[in-house]
Amino acid sequence: MSQTISTPVRVRFAPSPTGFLHVGGARTAIYNELLRQSVGGAFVLRIEDTDRERSDEAMTRQIQSALAWIGIVWDEGPFLQSERLARYRERGEELLAAGRAYRCFCTPAQLEEQRAAAQKRGQAFRYPRTCLGLDAAEVGARVAAGEPFVVRFRMPDGDIRFHDLVRGEMDFPPDALDDFILLRSDSSPTYHMSVVCDDIDMRITHVIRGEDHLSNTPKHIPLFQALGGEVPVFGHLPLILGPDRKRLSKRSGATSVEELRAEGFLPQALYNYLALLGWNPGGDREILSRVEMIALFSVDRLNASPAVFDREKLTWMNSQYLSSLPQAELLPHLRPFLAEQGLAAGTGGADAGGDLDPARLAAAIELHRGRVHTLEELAQVVAPYFRDRLDYPSEAIAKFAADPGLAGHLAALRERFASLPAFTKEALEAELRAVAGERGIKAGALIHPTRTALSGSQAGPPLFDLIEVMGREASLRHLDHLLESLREPAAAAAPAAGGPKASNAAAKPEPPHSSQG
């Protein structure tokens, strides 16, 4: 059904700047880039901004930013269709002169009446070519009189057939097509006119786009031919569905690249996940580097069936990248989330009293990154290592305050930690267990409140690793703060939501049992 491409290509990604870059659009861009990278050629970025009412310059910038963030590199562009309006009008005049297009003076009211009549008959509306037979003299007179008109393409007779890279052989009968509009009454181009003119001028050889454009292709092929252009090879990707198996929408959660970026997903993970959402590289591996994906990519392994956007699977994949990326690659993506916590790596934090210690930051990241799912969670669990004070969950303070002997036990532990010659995890564990034994309590009676004191959470990595990384000064400061909170629990306790979201970051998720899309 499909075919392999082995020669250099010219592909394009052509979003409309009417909103944030959707994950479906990002996946289309990824497949175009992978094809270009795998066989050579050029990747063209084109902004289809001829819809004056809905297009937004800010969205044009945002789309470019989102593409760059996810790691997509284009070779040419961005080209703006709004800067090529004269070219579309010029090509429209050529079609009129060649008899491949004609002026239509039918009013919207007339067309609506015809559409209603067709609906009443239970038929799909096709423009009845009312104006096709007008002679040149009448057309000239009506144009001279200032009567509004559109320019319609004269569709050829017969079926339109083509081979789709994803779907195989396609056949559209003539009764499914009509003479569509090329230029509106204000001379602005429709999508059909601008996209075909651009693909010809930009020498596009392969058009890989969403299946929502499949019905446009039988219109575009004869237009390519009428304009003297080489018809590109087409491939139409299936839609991405939500968990309800309906078209992915806001009700399914974040659907734009920008939203997922803000939630703490890494670009490497999102690229990897979207690439596998409709493409099967073969084998069982799901974590693939960009180099590996380029080497493995082939359009004959693109799936024609819709893929379901599985947020759980994306979250798992993100956790794998959080665990494995070199810190030099990870830290630039983490910095904005540290800033949200009042901490700025390399420039000090809101209450850190100076620059963040790079060694402690690196150690804290290493300790926690295998236990979190997103950059947001990682920043939340790293923040206590650099804060002067933490907000403790009110229920934890209430529980600790109910134990009349706990404050004394913690105070004794605090003094022993302060006098330790070597502040290592082995020495810390030995000292805590010694204090517990001397005071006739179990070690757990000290471990749980100590963890809360230092992290604001009751879950996390091994406690003594945490204390060693945090260091003597910060650890003693947090123990002092918890002791102060126990003396005045009502005044010092904060709502549970004020602390780090440790419950969401306590354990790495297992990979869900689902296909690669």
Q: Predicted regions: what is each one?
A:
Residues L21, S55, R161-H163, D244, ...:
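Short acidic, gly/pro-rich beta-turn/loop elements at beta-sheet edges
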Residues P17, D51, D157-D159, S188, ...:
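Residues that cap or initiate secondary-structure elements
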Residues E57, R61, I70-G71, L80, ...:
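Conserved nucleotide- and phosphate/pyrophosphate-binding catalytic cores
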Residues R103, T107-H236, G242-L248, P281:
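Active-site cores that bind ATP or allylic diphosphates and position pyrophosphate for catalysis
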Residues V11-P17, L45-D49, M202-V207, T255, ...:
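Glycine- and acidic
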Residues S2-K120, N216-G229:
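N-terminal Rossmann-like or analogous alpha/beta NTP/dinucleotide-binding catalytic cores
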Residues S16, Y31, Q119, T130-G133, ...:
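General helical structural elements
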